[in-house]
């Protein structure tokens, strides 16, 4: 099954569906419009609508996470063997991107439901062109290897593919980006303030072996993400435990 946060009509998901027809019957269940930066949001305050576009494509009036829930419980004829979220036109690299990304969230939602899931994002070349066919060929080759072996329980793969030629593939950890978002302030016709949040141009910082830096060297990055977000080092921190014990006594 395929989903994304750009909409069922986006070039990346269409190219990927056509390519994966070689090894199966991939369904698209994706938003009916742009849903970037929605993370794991669910639509709870108004009903969702589903439109059948063709025999293997469904458009949902919701987020990527909504799409996964509806696909598994109401749309697909059977539980999918794999979920691919993407291909996103633009990177999803580093701790900040994956926290906001609807593309990554679609894959994480699949993992929550016990289905092996992968998020795929692509980077443009110097002219701004996305090489979706090249990226789809890589995903096709990868799935041939992954489907027989699945993924470890609770693990989602976050894959970012630079423009060709690529030097190879590296398993990486998440890096960090330093964002300086531009806040644009304007006034409406009634002189009320309103704002747009811009992303600005982020700068990669930190470990040279992290995804945000490795991809700049021309490598495909594959970053395993785990649904368990517990910080086990802090969990063992005796000072933190003592602090909360003192808080408990003062509170009671």
Task: Name what the model sees in each region.
Residues 1-20:
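N-terminal beta1-alpha1 ligand-phosphate binding loop
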Residues 3, 29-31, 61, 85-88, ...:
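Short beta-strand segments
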Residues 14-74, 78-79:
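A cross-family phosphate/adenosyl-ligand binding-site feature
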Residues 78-98:
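Glycine/small-residue-rich loop that forms an oxyanion/phosphate-binding "nest" at active or ligand-binding sites
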Residues 98-105:
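Charged helix-capping and loop-helix junction motifs
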Residues 106-110:
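Hydrophobic/aromatic ligand-binding patch that stacks against planar heteroaromatic rings
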Residues 111-134:
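Glycine-rich phosphate/pyrophosphate-binding loops
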Residues 132-252:
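Electrostatically charged, flexible surface regions
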């Amino acid at each position: 099954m395929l989903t994304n946060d750009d909409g069922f009509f986006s070039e990346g998901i269409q190219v990927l569906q056509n390519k994966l027809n070689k090894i199966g019957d991939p369904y698209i269940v994706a938003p009916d419009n742009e849903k970037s930066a929605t993370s794991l949001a669910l639509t709870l305050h108004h009903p969702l609508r589903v439109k059948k576009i063709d025999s293997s494509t469904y458009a949902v009036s919701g987020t990527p996470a909504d799409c996964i829930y509806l696909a598994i419980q109401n749309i697909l004829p059977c539980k999918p063997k794999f979920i691919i979220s993407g291909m996103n036109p633009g990177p999803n690299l580093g701790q900040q991107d994956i926290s906001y990304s609807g593309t990554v969230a679609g894959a994480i939602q699949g993992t929550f439901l016990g289905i092996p899931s992968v998020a795929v994002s692509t980077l443009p070349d110097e002219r701004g062109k996305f090489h979706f066919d090249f990226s789809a060929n890589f995903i096709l080759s990868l799935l041939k290897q992954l489907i027989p072996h699945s993924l470890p329980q609770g693990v989602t793969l976050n894959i970012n593919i630079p423009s060709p030629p690529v030097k190879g593939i590296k398993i990486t950890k998440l890096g960090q980006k330093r964002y300086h978002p531009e806040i644009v302030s304007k006034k409406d016709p009634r002189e009320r303030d309103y704002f747009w949040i811009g992303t600005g141009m982020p700068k990669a910082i930190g470990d040279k072996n992290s995804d945000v830096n490795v991809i700049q060297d021309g490598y495909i990055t594959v970053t395993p993400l785990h649904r368990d977000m517990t910080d086990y080092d802090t969990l063992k921190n005796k000072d933190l435990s003592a602090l909360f014990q003192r808080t408990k006594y003062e509170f009671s």
